[in-house]
Structure formats: C-alpha cells, structure tokens
Amino acid sequence: MKLLKPTWVNHNGKPIFSVDIHPDGTKFATGGQGQDSGKVVIWNMSPVLQEDDEKDENIPKMLCQMDNHLACVNCVRWSNSGMYLASGGDDKLIMVWKRATYIGPSTVFGSSGKLANVEQWRCVSILRSHSGDVMDVAWSPHDAWLASCSVDNTVVIWNAVKFPEILATLRGHSGLVKGLTWDPVGKYIASQADDRSLKVWRTLDWQLETSITKPFDECGGTTHVLRLSWSPDGHYLVSAHAMNNSGPTAQIIEREGWKTNMDFVGHRKAVTVVKFNPKIFKKKQKNGSSTKPSCPYCCCAVGSKDRSLSVWLTCLKRPLVVIHELFDKSIMDISWTLNGLGILVCSMDGSVAFLDFSQDELGDPLSEEEKSRIHQSTYGKSLAIMTEAQLSTAVIENPEMLKYQRRQQQQQLDQKNATTRETSSASSVTGVVNGESLEDIRKNLLKKQVETRTADGRRRITPLCIAQLDTGDFSTAFFNSIPLSSSLAGTMLSSPSGQQLLPLDSSTPSFGASKPCTEPVAATSARPTGESVSKDSMNATSTPAASSPSVLTTPSKIEPMKAFDSRFTERSKATPGAPSLTSVIPTAVERLKEQNLVKELRSRELESSSDSDEKVHLAKPSSLSKRKLELEVETVEKKKKGRPRKDSRLLPMSLSVQSPAALSTEKEAMCLSAPALALKLPIPGPQRAFTLQVSSDPSMYIEVENEVTTVGGIRLSRLKCNREGKEWETVLSSRVLTAAGSCDVVCVACEKRMLSVFSTCGRRLLPPILLPSPISTLHCTGPYVMALTAAATLSVWDVHRQVVVVKEESLHSILSGSDMTVSQILLTQHGIPVMNLSDGKAYCFNPSLSTWNLVSDKQDSLAQCADFRNSLPSQDAMLCSGPLAIIQGRTSNSGRQAARLFSVPHVVQQETTLAYLENQVAAALTLQSSHEYRHWLLLYARYLVNEGFEYRLREICKDLLGPVHCSTGSQWESTVVGLRKRELLKELLPVIGQNLRFQRLFTECQEQLDILRDK
C-alpha cells in the first residue's frame, strides 16, 4: 500500500467536506468552504497517481473551480455515467453541473488572473425543494434518480431524466437527515438521521420498508455527516455512528431480514463515513495453489472523528489496515477509484489523502459479468430499476409488443448514429475554419479592431468582443418529458457515447427537443401545436396555414372571412323621443372626408390582397365611420363586359359605403324592439358595380351591376357569374348590397332584407329569404350560407338539404364587453360558424347543444405552460392544418413558454399540459375537424403513455373499442367526426406499445380487436 497526501489539493485552508472520484478515474471533485461562498473544485487525478506528472508544470493540477453556491458545499457526487456532477450545500440548493467544451482556459473570478480553469463546467439545473441545508446527495444506479437529504428531516427523490421533477418526498425522520445510499440492485434507498434511526425505503412505491433504531439508541447528534454505504453485492448495509456497549461502531445490517448481529468496532470516536469498494473480490490464486474456487468478498473503508481510517475485508475478522492520526481533524468523506485499488479521503482540516493498494493486498476483482451473475443468482435480476417508461424486470408477454420495442430501439440507434455524425462534423468545423485554427482567428481579431479619428483628431477605437467559443453539447432548456426507455439504459452502460441519450438538461415544443426520438420542429403556421406567434398573425390578410405542405391535409378548404375591424360593432342607447342620428345630413366637408377615407381603405385592401392563390380567403368589410350615417360615394366605375382585370377581381366588395336609399331600411331595423343597450353592426351600401373572386374556386368570378337601365325605364340589377369560361347571368329587382359564393352556391343580399340563393349554373334554389334585419356580412362554404345581420343575429342554412343549421342566434352573449368587437369570422365545411373577437378569444356555435363554445384564447395560460414536445412523433406530424389551426393561429410560443417553465413546477406543468391537450381534442371534436381530431387525440394519448396516466389512457381505449359483443341496448357509436373509432384504436396500439408499463392494456386491446376482426 502507498500513502500520499497531495498538499496542492486544498481550499486555501478552508474545510473540505466531500470528495468524489470521476468514474473514468481521470479527475476528482472536492466540495467545501470557499472564501465567501461554497466551493466546488475539479482536480486532475494524474498528478496524484504519477509523481512525474505532479512535477511536470505543463500538466494542470486544478481543472475547474466553481463558486456558484452561496454557502458551504457539503457533498459532491458524480453521476454513474460521469457526464454530470451534483453538489449540495448550506444554501438549500442542489446544483447539477455539466462540462462545456470551451476553446482555451479562463481565469477564476476574483483570483486576479492567477488561477485558470482548464475545463469549463456550467450549471445545467438548480433543484429547489429543501428548506434547510442539503447534507448529502446520491445518484441511483443508471442515473435514473437523484436523491438528496437535508436538515429539514426529508429525503427528496428527483427525476434525473426530467429535472426538476420531484418523484417523491420521503417523510418519516424526526431529526436531521445526514446520509443516503442506494442498494446496487435498485430496489431500496437507505437514509440515516440524528433521530437515532436508519430507514430503508422501497423504490417501487417510495414507502418505508423498515426502520432500524436499536443500534442507535445510545447515539447523539455529534457528527457533521452520517454517510452510510451498501455493499456491491447487496447483502449488507453498513451504517455510520452506531453504539455497542457504549463504544462507537459501524453497524452491519443484513439485507435478509434486516438483522443487526455484526458491526465494525475499534474506532475510539463516532464513525462519520463508510464507503464500500465498488468491486467484488476473490482471493488471488498463487502459483501452484489449488484451483478450488474462493468465496467472493467485499472491501469497506471506515472513517471516524478520531482522525483514523480503517479498511476491512468481509472475509477477515480484523481490519486489513488501520491508519491513525491521518488528519488533524475528523474524516468527512471517502471515495474509491473505479478499479477498486485506490481511495481518496478528505478531512475537515482541508486536506486529502490517497491510498493506493495492490491486487496482492485486496484480491482479484470480479468482472462485471461475474458480478451480474451474483446479482441474478441472489435477486433474480440485476439493477431492476423501475421508472415511468422502463420496467427492466418486466417480461414482454406479447410478440407484437416485442416488435414495437425492437422498432423503438432501432429508431433510437439510428438517432444516435445520426447525432454522432453531426457531432463529429461540428467538431471538425469548429476546430478549423477555412484552414485556420480557432486560436489563430482569436489572435487575428486583436489586429482587426476598428480605429477611427474624429474631426478634432482624437482617436476612437471600437472594441471587439472576443468571447469564448463554446463547442459543447448544449441543450436549449431543462424541461422535458422523455421517459428513460429500457434500451436507453442498456446503451448508457454499453458505451460512453450512449451518455448523450440521457437528456438531463434537454428541453421540451409544445414543441424541437434534444431527445432521441424527436426532430427539431419547423416553425410553420399550419401546425396546431398550441404555440403562439405575434398578435398580428391572427389578423393577417394572408394565411400561410392554408398553403403550407402537410402530411395530414384536410380534403376540403376552410374559408375564413376576416369581416370586421376594430370599428365593427357600435353600441347605442335608444333614447325615446330623441331624433335619430340617421336623420343628420352631413356637410360637404364631411362628404369629402368620407371619399378620402374610402380611397385610403381601398388602397390598403389592394396591397393586402396581392396573393390570389391562398386557400383561405379573408374579406374585411370596414365600417367607414363611427357615425351611423354612411353616404354613398361614387368611387367604383361601371365595369366593362367580359373577364375583369386582375386588380378589379381582387377588389373587396366590402369597401362600399351606405347610400341614402338604404337609410330607410336601417331606420326600420333600428325601430325594432331592442334592449336599452343595443348592438349594431355596420351595413354595406350598394355600389354601382363590383367584382368578387370566389376564394374556394379561383376560376370563379361574380360580377354585380346595380341600376341597369332597361327599355321600359325600369331599373334592375344584373348578376353575372363566370366559371372556367362558362358564364351565366340573371337580373334582380333590388340593388345588391353584397355577394358571396362557393363551389356549390352563389348568394346575394339585396335591399329590403332579401337574400337570394342560386346554383353555380344560375338556377334559383330558393325563393328570396326575408332576413330579420339588414345584412351585415354574407359568407358561403360548400352548400352552407351564413348571414350576419346588423342586429347581431347569425343564421346558417344548408341550401342543398334546405334545413337550418343555426337559427337567428344572437351574438350578445359573446360580445359582452363594452369595447368588444369581432375581428374574424369562419364558416367550416360542416357549417360550424366561428367568431374571433378582439380580445383574442374565439367561439364556435354548437348546433347540437345550441351553445357558444370557447375554442381558442390567445391569452390562455394553459397554452403558455403546456409542454408536450416529447409527445411529438415527428416534424411532419405537426403539419396538420384545419379550422382549429386557422383559428388559433399559433406556430411557436417557445419564447413565452421558456420564460414560464423555469418558474412553473413540473407537477403544475404536467397538469396544464393535460388540460391543454384535452381542450384541443374537445375543440377539434366540436368543430368536426376529423384530421385535427385525429392529430390531437394521438398526441394526447402519446403524452399519457409517456407520463404514465393509465386510467385516462384506458378510458380512451375503452371508448374507441366499444362493446366486443353485440348488444341492442348499447348507445356506443362506431364513428366520431367521420372516423372509425376502432381504426383509431389500431393507430394508438403502437404508441401504447412503447411503454412496457402498459403491455397488459396493449394485450387486452389487441386481443379484443382480433376477436372483432374474426367476427
């Protein structure tokens, strides 16, 4: 054995409370007290192991120093993969660190340039839950969980896959919890506290397995820490600071029955730390000796307040070695090297010691295969870690389930290979740019600073920012919901490169996440992801959502009509006996202002309507003044016969102003009985002529000419329709105020509240419909005709079936605010009217329930906090367009989401995500949008699978499956919005098959579908 105390490992005379060696053995970390804060230092292991490296000045001894903790650091622990370092301190925080590959060293802050950080480590997550000092942290096998204990008497289990999610808070101790340890087979976690107890908790349900108190009855809270340890074979748990006949011991607790019949004795003061060697040993065979197999044994190091260290072998009754007065103060922590032959010990006196053993002294270490066989023979399975998405001990009972699991593993392997290629490509690019190294570029930048001289001759130098270039593997955020799959754990164990598959600090879309199964999501407005863009996107004239490429395309086009601006609605109080405002005759100056306003609005409309190839047509009829009197302005000349010009065919019909002839009809409407606060919508006035292009059929044009003089002197209005060169025309006795068309019908609204409907060949389908009040907006989609009147009543008819869909429904219930206006109108292909209001809310009318339903809200906090990027199957699946996507108009709310998710607890985020996805499914169902319903249902089910919500998932499967056997009394419907429910269930099965936890549900649904198929 060799003993070394490297004096250069220190915290400037301050105490060192913790030490831990990196799994690859190249570095080690110390944690303790700094000058004015807690200090975490990462040291090079090579100068400790090799004397030549210690003397070589070119080999750095200190790699990095982090002073982020506000108070003393009590514990530092490397993850088993070596990718992360966790530190806990008196500031009640746990910080998780990850290396950042910077170019070149940097100096330690406050060291006046004397200390340099060779490696750069950044804090990727700060875990806040404890209300007192954090005394110990411990990573579980395979890094699935991180446990922390505190003087607040609790143990917190963190989900290391999705920081900062808390899986459980273990409450049961009545004193300061000062030590933690996981058993090597992942079934228990043990904690020791000042309440004179050691408690063992089950990881299956995070409940108490046993509480051991007898060996600690005589103990007092005299130690700073109580670091207990579990043997690598899982047979023994050794505690710190127990008492036997008033003498300090380290109590040995047998896993079988939790018996306390043995202990390590000999120390004169309380035991502070116990640490088992990670290796299992067997006796070294000497030359010529018998080949009889030896019994495996373990090695354990014990540190005490008496400043001595003892090393024990479980095959010996006495310690292998005892070193007295190794330090000036109490021993605080112990760490073994991964090969099991070296040990680092730290003390409160601020120094560390390294002991180097030989195989002749300890024995031959067993291989990992032999160690795994010992676990299997004793416990059946090794490392039986159970998380939400990984059940290593579960047996796959269904061949279809096995097929899905293998497919998922192959996809993860492909993603890993692609990521490896991208990383190698990026490293080659960042290392050399155009044949010049980054270091040379950095030096040349100093020579290229910009220098100018002012008029008075003084020099002005523009400084250049020469920042460190980070080439590390950085993710965008720390929130994600990627479950740790069974194949993922195996990959992490098999190769170091698999470490990148553990997304500790990766985010998570609603919506591109750095996870194995999700590609970066493109920003396209055709994607109904619940994300949001700027407020102007909702009111844009063009709608990119309709023209974006999509895998889940809708067979029919939606025709939203952006019909109202901020001056849409007017509220007036009816004053009995007072003269009507409509009787006021405007002056010539006012008439001129009206004409100028018309010209200005027309020019704006022409500029905003330049794209004639949109799938979604938005028409914006504007009320030209807040005055109720609107005069006719002769601004549109009589159109020539034949095909209209391009600029005229795009001219919105809604730019007309009201004529004096229409005042009588408006006055008639205002004379109707109304409440004290009446809602009045603008009325379009007749034009001499106008042309309208039908948005659903670009080859279809509607031309209207009012007051056409005939031979008898009778004035008529002419309606023309041109479709693919085929033209028809008809005449009407009243002047046409507005017109609309679709691929199925053409309708016009005339004076005297008349609405006429024609087929696309010019045949009148219905006698003129008398509207309850003058028309305000007219719109057609397919066979559906929607009329919105000046009295704010809405009607929708199916003219082919000649039935009413919505009958004179009032908008008063949704326009409740004094300044509320309608900013956009939609009529879906199923005749569902949708109103977008100025406050960002959108309501659709449900004909079945005769209610207005809220389907979108731009200020919805659920959409801002929802995070379901882990549930996105692919980039293409997000390109789902439809009425819901057009209404919501969201493509990316990552900015608002990122700002909120850092302050939103994961439990709240999980609940808001569920609520948001359920709202999306319900909204798509109400809008009868089959493609969007399928999209959001699959997304919702995938999130339930990832988060482990079995009850809700089972309810969905039950509804989609329906009764297996025929029943006359069953009310179950086999379709939903035109989709067969059992076909949807078949699409859900591969999603359910990704989580072994739901294999029973998968098998049940699969078997019942097979029974139905055989029938």
Swiss-Prot record:
Residues 413-431 have a biased composition (Polar residues). Its main location: nucleus. Pfam families: Beta-prop_CAF1B_HIR1, Hira. Coiled coil: none annotated. It is found in: Nucleus; Nucleus, PML body. Residues 594-824 are annotated as: Interaction with histone H2B. Residues 421-479 are annotated as: Interaction with ASF1A. Residues 408-431, 494-558, 603-623 are annotated as: Disordered. The modification Phosphothreonine is found at T554, T575. This is Protein HIRA. Interacts with CCNA1, HIRIP3 and NFU1/HIRIP5. Part of a complex which includes ASF1A, CABIN1, histone H3.3, histone H4 and UBN1. Interacts with histone H2B, histone H3-3B, PAX3 and PAX7. The keyword Transmembrane helix does not apply. Residues 494-507, 540-556 have a biased composition (Low complexity). It comes from the Eukaryota. CDD domains: WD40. Keywords: Chromatin regulator, Nucleus, Phosphoprotein, Repeat, Repressor, Transcription, Transcription regulation, Ubl conjugation, WD repeat. WD repeats lie at residues 11-53, 68-107, 129-168, 172-211, 220-263, 266-322, 326-367. Residues 593-737, 738-826 are annotated as: Interaction with PAX3. Required for the periodic repression of histone gene transcription during the cell cycle. Cooperates with ASF1A to promote replication-independent chromatin assembly. Required for the formation of senescence-associated heterochromatin foci (SAHF) and efficient senescence-associated cell cycle exit. The modification Phosphoserine is found at S111, S548, S556, S583, S608, S609, S610, S612, S659, S673. Sumoylated. Belongs to the WD repeat HIR1 family. Residues 439-475 are annotated as: Required for repression of histone gene transcription.
